């Protein structure tokens, strides 16, 4: 896709995970709840649709010997929309665990001429028509902030049930007053859309569920401690952002085990101590919707508890609009 705000750099990590027997043995012994979600990530995972099908079939065999129900999802750019729809319709993927990234109706980030805006938009609309509970994620950036309202209406008019507006890591314009003003107008329009359409607006969920928490607790990463990332070599990480090969920010490995050897609890304890440090930003902030990636903070600033603090004003605007909409003080 070659998005001009992509943090991955020019390097491409080739290869896919294939140690299905080691994975099954690991999952068999792993303590779990009644349900365990498995998500395929990339790159673009739908390039390997046949491999995904094989892995899902094998993993589901564990339901015969282990009291657990597996659900499967992935994150995609949506271009392989026929493969995605097939995986959902055939019962391989759980529709609500699928996320599709989109830059909106007037995206200008497709460098390959065969992927023009019309092709990308039609791919997204095809997915929504067949699978309306898939979450469509729209990045907030300069070249689409004025058209996000139109893009959301295009999705909702086609039956979309779940939309998220997501922030780009280290995007400098989030601190510029003129861009903040643009975003404020955009968020106000989104709130008006929400009053007319029934859909899941992911941005407001953290405000809803975290309203009674302290800001420092609410803004912690929801992945760390509840997720395990398995890379193509079978190594275990707290999440995909801590894998050095895939994240240009991380310079030290935070590997916490391997499928064969299991989880390194000494390393997880070290990680826990890092994450429990007091957040290094304003003590007076009330933005329970705040979030910064600990892995990026570690790689760029040198510590997981430090903060860029460049989304603060936008998060506060979102929070105030949410409170006004819901009549919160």
Model-identified regions with their sequence ranges:
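Radical SAM enzyme [4Fe-4S]-AdoMet core and its adjacent flexible, acidic
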Residues: 15, 110-233, 241-254
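A general structural signal for short secondary-structure junctions and capping/turn motifs
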Residues: 90, 218-221, 227-230, 272-274, ...
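Residue-level signal for well-ordered alpha-helical positions
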Residues: 6-9, 87, 242, 296
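Canonical Radical SAM [4Fe-4S] cluster-binding loop centered on the CxxxCxxC motif
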Residues: 1-20
């Amino acid at each position: 896709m070659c998005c001009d705000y992509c943090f991955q750099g020019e390097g491409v990590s080739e290869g896919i995970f294939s140690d299905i027997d080691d994975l099954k043995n690991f999952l068999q012994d792993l303590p779990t709840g009644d349900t365990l979600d498995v998500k395929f990530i990339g790159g673009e995972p739908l390039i390997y649709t046949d491999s995904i099908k094989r892995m899902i079939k094998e993993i589901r065999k564990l339901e015969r010997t282990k009291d657990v129900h597996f659900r499967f999802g992935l994150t995609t750019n949506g271009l392989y929309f026929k493969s995605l729809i097939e995986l959902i319709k055939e019962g391989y993927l759980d529709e609500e665990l699928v996320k599709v990234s989109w830059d909106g109706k007037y995206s200008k980030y497709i460098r390959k001429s065969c992927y023009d805006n019309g092709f990308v938009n039609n791919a997204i609309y095809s997915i929504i028509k067949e699978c309306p509970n898939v979450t469509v994620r729209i990045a907030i950036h300069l070249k689409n902030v004025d058209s996000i309202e139109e893009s959301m209406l295009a999705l909702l008019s086609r039956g979309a049930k779940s939309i998220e507006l997501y922030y780009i890591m280290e995007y400098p314009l989030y601190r510029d007053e003129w861009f903040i003003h643009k975003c404020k107008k955009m968020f106000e329009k989104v709130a008006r859309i929400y009053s007319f359409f029934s859909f899941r607006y992911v941005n407001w969920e953290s405000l809803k569920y975290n309203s009674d928490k302290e800001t420092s607790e609410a803004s912690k990463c929801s992945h760390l401690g509840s997720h395990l990332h398995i890379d193509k070599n079978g190594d275990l990480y707290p999440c995909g952002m801590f894998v050095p090969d895939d994240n240009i920010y991380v310079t030290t490995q935070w590997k916490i085990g391997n499928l064969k050897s299991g989880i390194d609890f000494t390393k997880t304890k070290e990680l826990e101590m890092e994450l429990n440090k007091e957040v290094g930003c304003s003590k007076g902030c009330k933005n329970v919707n705040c979030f910064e990636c600990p892995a990026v903070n570690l790689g760029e600033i040198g510590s997981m508890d430090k903060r860029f603090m460049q989304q603060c004003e936008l998060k506060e605007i979102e929070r105030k609009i949410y409170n006004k909409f819901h009549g919160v003080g």
